[in-house]
Amino acid sequence: MAIKDVLREELAASVRMQARFAAELAALPRGSLVRRIIKGHAYYYLIYRENGRFQSVYRGKSVLPAELRRYREAKAKRAKVRRSLSQLKKQIRYLKGALRGNEEI
């Protein structure tokens, strides 16, 4: 009985962490800034997905370095959080499978 209790506690903690990661992803700015060279001139666009399709919003010929850094950091953080979220989902699936059995442990 004690092992199942520990597994239930771990499952509850994992579900809470999953919600926290989802909120963290939602707080990040969506998309990424892309520099396109068109006829020898550089233009910046914000690229993101909406309803499964890529959307491109013109941001100007130049973008502030702080904005470039913000989107670069957000992209790195988004990748890190998504990796963690993927591992957490696998852990939750495993814990639910371990708790599914009817026999006493």
Functional labels for PLM-detected ranges:
Residues 1-105:
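Conserved glycine(s) in the ABC-transporter nucleotide-binding domain "signature"
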